[in-house]
């Protein structure tokens, strides 16, 4: 029999209250359990001491026997200093998907083309101004003479 330590929901609609229980992993979430080892009230403030209450010696016993805490319960146990939770590392989670990468490449390509066009436009008037300047200077010399 695989034993898990998990949350069993109680309370009324929109007012959750959880028991931290040890139960057969195949039993329903709110069904029969072997032992209640704590409570969790998410409606209380995060710094409230009654938000998570654990019976530490029973929790340690069940972990020693082989009960597997769920992720949420493991976080609570880690915060209480009962069982250290291994940090998870998923660097691919932050990586954008294929379509997002394609859109980013298209945007970068459009920006490059716009920069090239702006550089070409800036270079063209400078050449025209250089070409027109001697003609204007010659015209000014003729009017002065």
From Swiss-Prot:
Residues 82-145 are annotated as: Disordered. Residues 116-137 have a biased composition (Low complexity). Residues 95-115 have a biased composition (Basic and acidic residues). This is Small ribosomal subunit protein bS16. Keywords: Ribonucleoprotein, Ribosomal protein. Belongs to the bacterial ribosomal protein bS16 family. GO terms for molecular function: structural constituent of ribosome. Gene3D superfamilies: 3.30.1320.10. GO terms for cellular component: cytoplasm; small ribosomal subunit. GO terms for biological process: translation. It holds the Pfam family Ribosomal_S16. InterPro entries: Ribosomal_bS16, Ribosomal_bS16_dom_sf. It comes from the Bacteria.
């Amino acid at each position: 029999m695989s034993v898990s330590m998990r949350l069993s929901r109680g309370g009324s609609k929109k007012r959750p209250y959880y028991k931290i229980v040890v139960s057969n992993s195949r039993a329903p979430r709110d069904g029969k359990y072997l032992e209640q080892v704590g409570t969790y009230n998410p409606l209380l403030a995060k710094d409230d001491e009654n938000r998570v209450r654990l019976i530490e010696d029973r929790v340690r016993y069940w972990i020693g026997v082989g009960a597997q805490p769920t992720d949420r319960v493991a976080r609570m146990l880690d915060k209480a200093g009962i069982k250290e939770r291994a940090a998870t590392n998923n660097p691919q989670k932050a990586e954008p998907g294929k379509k997002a990468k394609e859109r980013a490449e298209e945007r970068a390509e459009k920006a490059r083309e716009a920069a090239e066009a702006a550089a070409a436009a800036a270079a063209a008037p400078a050449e025209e101004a250089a070409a027109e300047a001697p003609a204007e200077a010659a015209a000014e010399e003729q009017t002065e003479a």
